[in-house]
């Protein structure tokens, strides 16, 4: 039975309970959850939540110092190291505040066993900061079709794909180089993975839930409008709901 390990770098921010609980209730039984923090404050906040929830599938790594040359929390730097320290057959990131539907890994495992693929992604739902539903993502993180706003720009969000250990042992260092290439991390990593491992499958299910981060209200409003406009454009382009990026074979 495949072992899946979910990886969440966190400082104990709002929404972590939702993230942890969504892994605990997975219908697929062989799933672990690895939390990593690199500050005392983050450790205390995470510990408080773990003591409250007492999750059986969760392990917590505490790094002795901050990672990143500017002293800030840099999850992409941590990723390149942590992949060598935990057990898994397949690995999936999940950000603090985001969560999976209960059948997420059941669906992922089904595709892995049915098709000759190295990695798998699921579609995502977009939620506002208060967990109110905004829309289904049929416009950006769709893998096999360009994003709604830019031709020839393909991407799967960095929390929507699940990759094999073989891939990470080969390409894991690409996480720490993403900032040096001045690209958003998930786009840079997606391109590197796809170039080297083009056998990408999809569950065709919306089982990853992405929540907008709290912050500058102007930026939040822009993000909301961008997502909603993207959904509107693609809905008008494919009014029958038959999307070309939904495939039965990979």
State each model region's role.
Residues 1-250:
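Nucleotide-sugar donor-binding/catalytic module of glycosyltransferases
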């Amino acid at each position: 039975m495949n072992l899946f390990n979910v990886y969440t770098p966190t400082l104990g921010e709002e929404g972590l309970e939702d993230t942890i609980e969504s892994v605990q209730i997975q219908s697929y039984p062989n799933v672990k959850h690895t939390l990593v923090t690199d500050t005392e404050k983050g450790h205390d906040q995470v510990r408080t939540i773990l003591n409250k929830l007492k999750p059986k599938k969760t392990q917590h790594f505490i790094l002795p110092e901050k990672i990143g040359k500017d002293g800030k929390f840099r999850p992409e730097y941590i990723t390149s190291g942590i992949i060598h320290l935990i057990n898994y057959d397949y690995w999936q990131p999940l950000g603090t505040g985001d969560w999976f539907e209960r059948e997420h890994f059941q669906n992922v495992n089904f595709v892995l066993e049915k098709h000759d693929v190295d990695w798998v992604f699921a579609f995502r739902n977009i939620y506002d900061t208060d967990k109110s539903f905004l829309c289904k993502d049929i416009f950006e993180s769709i893998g096999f079709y360009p994003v709604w706003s830019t031709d020839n720009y393909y991407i799967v969000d960095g929390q929507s794909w699940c990759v094999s250990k073989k891939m990470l042992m080969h390409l894991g260092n690409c996480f720490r180089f993403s900032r040096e290439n001045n690209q958003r991390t998930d786009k840079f990593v997606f391109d590197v993975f796809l170039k080297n491992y083009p056998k990408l499958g999809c569950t065709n299910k919306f089982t990853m839930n992405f929540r907008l981060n709290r912050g500058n209200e102007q930026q939040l409003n822009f993000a909301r409008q961008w997502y909603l406009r993207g959904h509107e454009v693609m809905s008008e382009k494919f009014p029958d709901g038959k999307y070309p990026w939904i495939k039965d074979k990979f």
